Amino acid sequence: MPPVFLKGSLAVGTVAIETTETLEIDASGREAMVLDLALPVLAGQGRSVRVVGFRSSMGVSGLSPREVARLRTLGLATSARATGIFEGANDFRLGFKSEQGGPIVAPSFGVQADLGGHPVAPLVSDLTIAAFGLAAGESLTHELKGFTHVRSATAHGYCGRTLAALAREFGLDLKISTEGLGFEPQGVGTVSVAASRLSKAGRAVDWKSPGVLRAIHVTLGGVRPKPEQLDRLEAEILESLWETRRIEPAISRVVSQGVDLGAFLQIDVECEHGGATFIDVAGRSAAPLPLARRAVKKALGFLDSEATFDEITGITALAASIATAGELEVSLPPTERLSSALSLFRDLGAFIEEEEAPGLLRLKVRSTSSAG
């Protein structure tokens, strides 16, 4: 269903003030993508939205408790007017602008959210994308507490290193840091998102080719992990990357004390233009060698693909460029999720040009405000 725009006016004394335009999005069949991409982009653009049909015909109807916590935090972080956001809701609104049409978000605005019992990675992605919409001279710092790592999770919300590099191209200073680890279902960790707009995103960013490999960063960590497990992980990664490609990765460890027991491995591939992130979360007693080999295989597969980003990082980067009103050219692996994301971005008014290449899809993406 194509997006619908709602408009009205508000009478104040004898003067009629036009309210902001509200985009209506039908979330049926694409609920996760609306949460992951549409709402953070609209928050960055300062565009109000009404979401309808959110899980309205499924066995479990409407917003889940975790989704409610996520949306309320996004609303707080952007000082939005949230209406109808409760467990089981199928229809809700987020007003990201004031009635006079000016942005609500103030300079140096930030949120401290204690989300014990909820994963923070999706929110890290939400607030990072929204931060790309900061105006020149504005800054913010968010601090989120909750599960920093969830088993079977994707790298959604972990792509901070690559997004920070893209942000610099768009005049934004961005830093995402994990300051304490917490694994589902017991621990609570802390992640901060800090952003400062140095200049307007005025130029197009041409990242059609990833360019040269700059580094591979490996982060090993956990809450009270077994030292021998991390030692074996590190040794296997060092050996695999050196024997196959003569690459020496930069390895760091992040260890927290707490009551939960968990370990994780994160590999960030840093290229001249773009990069990729792969994570694996395991129990304290998980065998380290399969974990290491899986991660190295993914990293080397990305390097051989000639893509600008992996799928998850790439779609997030496209969303960020639209939120910042910039223009971005990239090459991504064609996937069903990418196709769905492009369709959603078009519903938000983005202009997207596509060109096929061997094993890749070359894309040029411009937001409505940067087009023309």
Task: Walk through the language-model features, giving the residues of each.
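Structural preference for solvent-exposed beta-strand-turn elements
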Residues: 2-372
